[in-house]
Amino acid sequence: MLNHQSTYKIQNATLGFKEEIERLKVQAAMSWEKEFRLLKWYGLQNGMNVLEVGSGPGYVTEHLLQRLPDSYITALEIGKTLQNHAKQLLNGYSTNRIKYVEASVYDTNLPDNSFDFVIARLIFLHLYHPLEAAQELFRVLKPGGRLVIIDIDDGIFGTVNPEIPSLHNILMKISQYVSQRGGNRLIGRSLPRILINSGYIDIEIDSVIQHSDVHGIDGFKRQFDIKRLIPFYKNGVITSEEFEQMNKAYEALNHSAEAFAMMNYIVACGKKPLSI
């Protein structure tokens, strides 16, 4: 059996499988245009051999297939349930366009020096050993190839209107709880160092800002779905007062025309040297 070494397993999703899949679908679409613009700026081109790690249910994979019609996409995902969903979603695409690999990001079983570009979106925050993952992706990249990591940092998560007075404290409590279980919701600030320590050069770091007035409110409703916080409340991670503040924000996002939200992703890129 494959060892996940990760805090994310869809069977443990608080929302349940169907709602979690829908959340991932909306999440993939919200800032895709801005993310793709950055990917191109980092060097992603049509015709490249592309690896997407942590490809999940296939929604980002579908965007890549649509925008890179001459590229071959390898979708690596350790979760069989998620990969089966991706195969159903993308069954109209030829096997000449896409390959599915069920493997760990720590041990991909892929050949050395085989990919022009690797994309790791919202996976590093879950990994017990992010440095090992970055080193494995370094191995499979061609010399001159690039790894782009898109992830979060709850220290600069974003903001909500109406304001949640305890939002930062709530996020820090949840981050600490996740950290004790092997994840890192503050991973964004560490991405340049992870890349440097894995051998990458020409490090770049940027951010992708999402705003409900620009990207739609639906994704933020799902991000702030109060059901996602119930386990943290039940386990004593957040107080009843903090839970109620988040619940009021969730209700406002669903019912108030005055409500809005802004959220931030960190994007880091590193290049494998031409000679090692």
Language model segments and positions:
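Class I SAM-dependent methyltransferase Rossmann-like catalytic core
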Residues: T7-W32
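C-terminal helical/coil "lid" or tail adjacent to the Rossmann-like core of SAM-dependent
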Residues: I10, E20, E204-A259
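Conserved alpha-helix/loop element of class I SAM-dependent methyltransferases that forms part
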Residues: A29-N46, H63
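Class I SAM-dependent methyltransferase SAM/SAH-binding core
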Residues: L51, P57-D107
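A short acidic, Gly/Pro-enriched loop at the edge of an enzyme's catalytic core
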Residues: Y106-F117
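A short SAM/SAH-binding and catalytic strip from SAM-dependent methyltransferases
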Residues: D116-L131
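A short glycine-rich, Lys/Arg-flanked "PGG" loop and its adjoining helix->strand segment in the class I
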Residues: L131-R146
